[in-house]
Amino acid sequence: MKDLFEHIYANKGSIGRWSDHAEGYYVFPKLEGELGPHMKFQGKEILNWSINDYLGLANHPEVRKVDAEAAAEYGAAYPMGARMMSGHTTMHEELEKRLAKFVHKEASYLLNFGYQGMVSIIDALVTKNDVIVYDVDAHACIIDGVRLHFGKRYTYQHNDMESFEKNLERAAKLAETTGGGILVISEGVFGMRGEQGKLKEIVALKKKYPFRLLVDDAHGFGTLGPRGEGTGVHQGVQDEIDVYFSTFAKSMAGIGAFVAGNAKVVDYLKYNLRSQMFAKSLPMIYVKGALKRLEMMETMPELQQKLWDNVNRLQNGLKERGFNIGNTNTCVTPVFLHGSIPEAMAMVNDLREHYGIFLSIVVYPVIPKGMILLRIIPTASHSKEDIDRTLEAFSAIREKLETGVYRAINAELTKEMGDM
């Protein structure tokens, strides 16, 4: 018999294997200062493109004031216990009513954390006789939720409607034999590449196949729709989304999440979401803070307008310079380049140390070998000067990449890793 930890000591995993080279700089970096476009990294001022504070609410004075007042009045603990037992308040109910109205649903239910909330939603919605069909590029919280499913699941190629219908047909045939139903899961906005899920095309197939649709709209809520009501409203299909989910961690710059749908489904989830039934209620400081943030989304359209002004300036500028930003049609701005992992590391180091620009880097195995993805997250708080400075820097680093400067800088690391 082996020691349980033997495999842990031998292999840190696909990402952990690079920790000796990456930790503290490329992964687990420490950003300091007030949240926003201008922060500090390792003691230096940086222009930050790596936080999802889309509407600039994280450091908005009205938000900070309400957060401070709520903390002073309630502390960090109130209410204590799970919602079902002793952690329920009228403020939780008020937020749920307002969220439901905002996203055009009958009812909503608060979740204390987005990731575990989504895992629990999937677990609660399906039985072993049901079949799940989901996009292959779904977020990890969806994948982990699907892993709990004892029944069959099918993945379809990303945003590929031919692949989707093929797998939907397989699911329908299987569900006929098991006596179960079908749950389709998509993201409203895919956070890595910035593409909207093809919700309009998906719901059109409801006429042919009897399925229910769950949408994770973490990046669409607050950014899409006339007031930020989300991707479903933006595409005109919100009524066809059976279960709508979003987090407070992005546009609302807070903690928590919610799920919305018809009243009967939400009531069922209220009594069957294990991650909520057996966990502490969302603290009042976050509930009061979310109410304020929602009010600002409802009454300050200029925040969303400023966001999109910045998105358009950035994305148009990148395209004019010949950069490949994929098929993004949202705020998420990916820049695809050809290069190895060592070249990517040298490039990001150059951006941070010599251009003062901080952003997220994505490499293999998340994307294909030989590709580098630099993900830029524009917000309402960025300025035109921030964008123009970044565009100039990107032109400079691309030239260095293409002329082999970064390969030469990390020659030893390249030798160790190979052409990854």
UniProtKB/Swiss-Prot annotation:
Gene Ontology annotations of biological process type: biosynthetic process
Keyword RNA-binding attached: no
Catalysis performed (reactions): isopentadecanoyl-CoA + L-cysteate + H(+) = 3-oxocapnine + CO2 + CoA
Statement: the UniProt record of this protein carries the keyword Ion transport: no
Essential cofactor(s): pyridoxal 5'-phosphate
Residues bearing the modification N6-(pyridoxal phosphate)lysine: K250
Keyword entries, A-Z: Acyltransferase, Lipid biosynthesis, Lipid metabolism, Pyridoxal phosphate, Transferase
Protein name: Cysteate-C-fatty acyltransferase
Source species of the chain: Capnocytophaga ochracea (strain ATCC 27872 / DSM 7271 / CCUG 9716 / JCM 12966 / NCTC 12371 / SS31 / VPI 2845) (Bacteroides ochraceus)
